[in-house]
A protein has these predicted regions:
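Gly/Gly-Pro-rich "capping" loops immediately C-terminal to redox-active cysteine motifs
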Residues: 43-72, 79-83
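C-terminal capping alpha-helices of c-type cytochrome domains
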Residues: 8-11, 64, 83-104
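Classic N-terminal secretory signal peptides
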Residues: 2-20
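The canonical Cys-X-X-Cys-His
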Residues: 35-41, 93
Length: 104
């Protein structure tokens, strides 16, 4: 019985690390210049049409950028922007925006 509980706990712990992203926030900052027109210099958008990126979860940003890039999610502005991003670019941008303080 103890071994079954141990295996179950191990599976839960293993599954909880699925959202870990190994991006480079410094490289993400360099790449973020193209994002600032809509999402703001510090990831805080001045227009309510575009979401704030500052403080956003890395895994969420990675998933959404992949969806835009791969055509799963479409937007007239984001889809062409995301199509230029490599997997490393996406990870780096996600790390950068996750490290910024979320807006008010």
């Amino acid at each position: 019985m103890k071994s079954i509980a141990g295996i179950f706990l191990f599976g839960i712990l293993l599954g909880s690390t699925g959202g870990v992203v190994a991006g480079d926030a410094t490289a993400g900052k360099d790449k973020s210049a193209a994002c600032t027109g809509c999402h703001g210099v510090n990831g805080i958008s001045s227009n309510p049409m575009w979401p704030n990126l500052a403080g956003q979860q890395e895994g969420y940003l990675v998933k959404q950028l992949h969806a835009f890039r791969d055509g799963v999610r479409e937007d007239p502005l984001m889809t062409p922007m995301a199509k230029t991003l490599s997997d490393a670019d996406i990870d780096n941008l996600a790390a950068y925006y996750n490290n910024l303080q979320a807006g008010q």
